[in-house]
């Protein structure tokens, strides 16, 4: 199959592209510039220069494709720089769907996010809007909702690498966030980190499995972990002992209200809200359907952090 990827040069795409090639498919990448494809096997990929805001480049990228995968996602928006959830996570999907309709491409796979909802944060709302647009516009769609994703970053932003840099390697104690005024349950909210190798295989295998069409799948690791357990596992993976102290979420949100418009501030109010909501899955049906045995989140599976 010829598979066009929108956002294929990011972290998730950098793992999906070689998985596509290994499965005998031909990836076609929409690329802003050659540097964005660093580390990818570009000699085995077709390339189209342009951005998701360019309808001409989108049309060229999807023309003649058997399937399109949309992977663009951002963790924070900076409206003053023209970087918004609505534009990249919703309007970009709309523009890509329009290009697919014009080119007669009916197979569309979307990377959404676990926990999306119509009345949540701006991030969650834009992802939900994208899902609804895909369902309304594409006859053969599949949506994946991964939890937080871990794995070798390959020079890109990755969950555990960022936590190591911002928290584990910091001289400050690691924050165990808690709601309210008392530190009851500090750091107890749960996430279910999913391995990037499993996410990549889910996307690739779904392309040739008609039974995945018209369905939304959650992708989580096999065992939820508390925030405290996640930080402890990352610290152990890099042979560090880390002091951890309860931290009131209200204090961090107050600081974020002043500074989260600046890229140097480590977390936004919405990010903290979503983090403390937890991120686990109620449905693991994708794995048996696609023949995937999900990898656990352990010290051994985080050995790549030692290279950081």
Protein language model annotation of sequence segments:
Residues 3-25:
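N-terminal Rossmann NAD(P)H-binding glycine-rich loop of SDR-like oxidoreductase domains
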Residues 15-19, 99, 133, 233:
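Rossmann-fold NAD(P)-dependent oxidoreductase module
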Residues 23, 118-232, 236:
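Oxidoreductase cofactor-interface core, primarily capturing Rossmann-like NAD(P)-dependent enzymes
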Residues 25-32:
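Conserved glycine-rich Rossmann-like NAD(P)H-binding loop of the short-chain dehydrogenase/reductase
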Residues 35-95, 99-102, 114-119, 207:
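NAD(P)H-binding glycine-rich loop region in Rossmannoid oxidoreductase-like domains
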Residues 200-267, 281-308:
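Mid/C-terminal beta-alpha module of Rossmann-like enzyme folds, strongest
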């Amino acid at each position: 199959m010829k598979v066009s990827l929108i956002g294929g040069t990011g972290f998730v795409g950098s793992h999906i592209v070689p998985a596509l090639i290994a499965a005998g498919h031909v990836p076609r990448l929409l690329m802003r510039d050659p540097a964005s494809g660093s580390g990818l096997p570009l000699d085995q990929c077709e390339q189209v220069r342009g951005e998701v805001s360019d309808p001409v480049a989108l049309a060229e990228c999807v023309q003649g494709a058997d399937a399109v995968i949309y992977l663009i996602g951002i963790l924070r928006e900076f409206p003053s720089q023209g970087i918004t959830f609505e534009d990249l996570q919703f309007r970009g999907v709309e523009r890509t769907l329009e290009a697919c309709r014009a080119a007669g491409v009916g197979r569309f796979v979307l990377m959404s996010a676990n926990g999306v909802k119509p009345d949540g944060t701006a991030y969650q709302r834009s992802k939900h809007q994208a899902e609804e647009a895909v369902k309304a516009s594409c006859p053969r769609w599949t949506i994946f909702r991964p939890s937080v994703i871990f794995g070798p970053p390959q020079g890109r932003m990755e969950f555990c690498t960022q936590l190591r840099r911002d928290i584990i390697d910091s001289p400050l104690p690691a924050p165990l966030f808690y709601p309210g005024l008392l530190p009851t349950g500090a750091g107890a909210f749960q996430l279910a980190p999913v391995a990037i190798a499993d996410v990549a295989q889910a996307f690739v295998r779904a392309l040739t499995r008609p039974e995945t069409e018209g369905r939304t799948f959650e992708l989580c690791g096999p065992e939820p972990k508390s925030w405290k357990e996640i930080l402890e596992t990352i610290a152990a993976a890099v042979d560090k002992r880390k002091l951890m102290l309860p931290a009131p979420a209200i204090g961090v949100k107050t600081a974020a209200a002043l500074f989260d418009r600046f890229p140097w501030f480590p977390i936004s109010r919405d990010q903290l809200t979503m983090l403390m909501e937890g991120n686990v899955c109620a449905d693991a049906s994708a794995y048996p359907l696609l023949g995937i045995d999900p990898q656990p989140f352990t010290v051994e599976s985080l050995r790549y952090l030692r290279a950081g």
